């Protein structure tokens, strides 16, 4: 994450929303350190209680307020228990099934939504996604997987939600970018590191 923040010239973050605490989604937390120091304050971190419990245990030093500590606090944890407003943007969280009883949070930001690490979406999730214009959505690989949506399932979700633009994310190494791009129907595209989406 550090390199992506540097490449994008990011110098300020209003908040960080965590979908869940799995390593591939949470272990960049320490990379927020330089931003927190630059901004002169800890960064507000949002997640459900299970995610915050994992983060504050695994990265206790990042949340600990101790003026004598070597590492100064870089994050303040906030539990998501419903819609909220951050940096002037309305955020609507919704639960997603991640397989084997695990759940993640998807997020809707006005006309845009972000849904990764999901293998099933319930009716409440589809209701939260209704009318979305841009949807960044999970698509791990072509074959079914027990914890992530695969290409066919993702396309079925997109057909139901009907966003103007859908961007596939969380793709594994088996998906060749150009081949996947060719297989995508109009309005659907694979994402890539550094992609900027105007909303």
Residue ranges and their predicted role:
Residues 99-104, 110-138:
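Active-site-proximal loop/helix segments of hydrolase catalytic cores
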Residues 122-199:
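Binuclear metal-ion centers of metallo-dependent hydrolases, dominated by the metallo-beta-lactamase
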């Amino acid at each position: 994450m550090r390199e992506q923040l540097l490449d994008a010239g990011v110098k300020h973050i209003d908040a960080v929303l965590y979908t869940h605490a799995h390593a591939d989604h949470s272990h960049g937390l320490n990379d927020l350190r330089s931003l927190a120091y630059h901004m002169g304050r800890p960064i507000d971190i949002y997640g459900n209680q299970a995610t915050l419990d994992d983060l504050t245990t695994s990265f206790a030093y990042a949340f600990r307020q101790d003026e004598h500590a070597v590492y100064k606090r870089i994050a303040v944890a906030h539990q998501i228990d419903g819609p909220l407003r951050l940096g002037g943007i309305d955020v609507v969280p919704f639960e997603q099934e991640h397989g084997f009883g695990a759940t993640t949070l998807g997020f809707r930001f006005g006309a845009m939504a972000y849904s990764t690490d999901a293998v099933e979406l319930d009716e409440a999730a589809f209701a939260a996604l209704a009318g979305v214009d841009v949807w960044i959505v999970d698509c791990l690989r072509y074959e079914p997987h027990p914890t992530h949506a695969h290409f066919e399932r993702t396309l079925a979700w997109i057909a139901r939600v009907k966003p103007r633009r859908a961007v596939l994310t969380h793709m594994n190494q088996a998906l060749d970018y150009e081949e996947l791009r060719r297989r995508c129907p109009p309005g659907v595209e694979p994402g890539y590191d550094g992609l900027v989406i105007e909303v």
